[in-house]
């Protein structure tokens, strides 16, 4: 068997050790055509990153001729030293091979990681805002400027507290990898509302969320999607979802970094749609799958709060879920109907559903800070920062929520 074919079949976690063995092999792993060949060598295999019990797992799913599936996976670690205490992760977001990791026990560190290269970049947020039980009130997204391929992180808190009355916490900010600076975005009267806990998915550099009109009924489910354009650093208009009935809860996923998928679960039907055209200001949908299910016996309703994965070629959808009696599970659905579930084991954390995102190895290099070339914050940005911090401090004095601020904020 030729050397290239042998190396192309290596599991991702072994490539770093192999590359360090020989310069010729290292240069081979940097070749784009070789990366494509390696992906093709795994035909029939769907690869994804799954977050369970605050640990990341690189998981491969091998689909049979029907909805049967074989699962193989191992934990992957940010730490190079396997003997050291591993970093615990509370959230993970994916953008073309890069993972944005939100840490469980460190409110003042974000990590961007390329598992293929083993590269990391640690980033300091400017402040942290939590409610009791340690719930991070911020939402996150990672994307890039399509003109310069410069990566950025969007971080925002947009939440209305009913006690104390009439307190709205609203702060959108963006981190630029080139400048190594956080900047407050001009978002003062948003026309959209992204429900707390709603996860965005990044596609072709931009991030999409399920959303609804700002002044709509509090208990109304999301009936639109909205895009944040990392090039213009602005949100687009609300775009309609394709469903005629929105009684079910909707969630989004990315299909091999090419399309967006939307899943809605009603009482007895699961629908999945995928995009045939998607831009910041326009989206067209095509129905991918409709499966009749019996929620009473087979699928618990809590699955709608989990995440899902689509294999477009195999015409299969997998929904990740958590139940009290069975632990973490994957529900398999295809054209033939509901194909049953796969047990992922008993979790330590009984409350959190496993999170999943599709994964394709990437040659993208994570930019490092420019060092002495680093830009200074503008006077306007300093004033905006002080104003937002003052608002959060005022809220803290009226409530039981905890506000803590980094002593290493990027104010110059």
Curated annotation (Swiss-Prot):
InterPro entries: F-box-assoc_dom_typ1 (IPR006527), F-box-assoc_interact_dom (IPR017451), F-box-like_dom_sf (IPR036047), F-box_dom (IPR001810), SCF_F-box_component (IPR050796). Residues 1-38 form the F-box domain. It comes from the Eukaryota. SUPFAM superfamilies: F-box domain. Signal peptide: none annotated. This is Putative F-box protein At3g22940. The lineage of its organism: Eukaryota, Viridiplantae, Streptophyta, Embryophyta, Tracheophyta.
């Amino acid at each position: 068997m030729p050397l290239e074919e042998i190396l192309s079949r290596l599991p991702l976690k072994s490539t770093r050790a192999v590359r360090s063995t020989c310069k010729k092999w290292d240069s081979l792993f940097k070749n784009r055509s070789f990366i494509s060949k390696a992906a093709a060598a795994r035909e029939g295999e769907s690869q994804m990153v799954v977050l369970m019990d605050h640990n990341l797992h690189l998981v491969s799913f091998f689909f049979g001729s029907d909805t049967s599936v074989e699962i193989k996976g191992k934990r992957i670690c940010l730490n190079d030293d396997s003997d050291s205490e591993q970093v615990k992760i509370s959230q993970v977001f994916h953008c073309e091979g890069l993972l944005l990791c939100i840490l469980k026990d460190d409110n003042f560190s974000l990590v961007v990681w390329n598992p293929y290269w083993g590269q990391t970049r640690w980033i300091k947020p400017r402040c942290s805002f939590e409610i009791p039980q340690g719930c991070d009130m911020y939402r996150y997204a990672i994307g890039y400027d399509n003109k310069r391929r410069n990566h950025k992180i969007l971080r925002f808190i947009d939440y209305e507290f009913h006690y104390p009355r009439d307190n709205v916490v609203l702060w959108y900010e963006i981190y630029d990898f080139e400048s190594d600076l956080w900047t407050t975005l001009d978002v003062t009267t948003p026309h959209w509302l992204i429900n707390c806990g709603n996860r965005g998915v990044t596609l072709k550099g931009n991030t999409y969320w399920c959303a609804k009109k700002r002044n709509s009924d509090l208990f109304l489910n999301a009936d639109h999607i909205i895009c944040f354009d990392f090039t213009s650093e602005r949100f687009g208009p609300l775009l309609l979802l394709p469903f005629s009935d929105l009684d079910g809860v909707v969630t989004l996923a990315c299909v091999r970094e090419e399309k967006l998928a939307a899943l809605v679960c009603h009482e007895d039907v699961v629908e999945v749609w995928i995009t045939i055209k998607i831009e910041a200001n326009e989206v067209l949908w095509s129905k991918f799958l409709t499966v009749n299910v019996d929620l009473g016996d087979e699928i618990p309703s809590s699955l709608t709060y989990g995440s899902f994965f689509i294999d477009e070629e195999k015409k299969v959808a997998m929904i990740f879920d958590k139940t009290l009696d069975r632990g973490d599970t994957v529900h398999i659905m295809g054209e033939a109907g509901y194909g049953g579930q796969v047990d992922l084991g008993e979790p330590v954390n009984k409350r959190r559903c496993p999170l999943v995102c599709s994964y394709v190895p990437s040659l993208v290099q994570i930019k490092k800070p420019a060092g002495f070339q680093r830009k200074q914050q503008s006077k306007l940005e300093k004033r905006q920062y002080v104003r937002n911090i003052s608002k959060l401090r005022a809220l803290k004095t009226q409530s039981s929520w905890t506000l803590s601020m980094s002593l290493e904020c990027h104010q110059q």
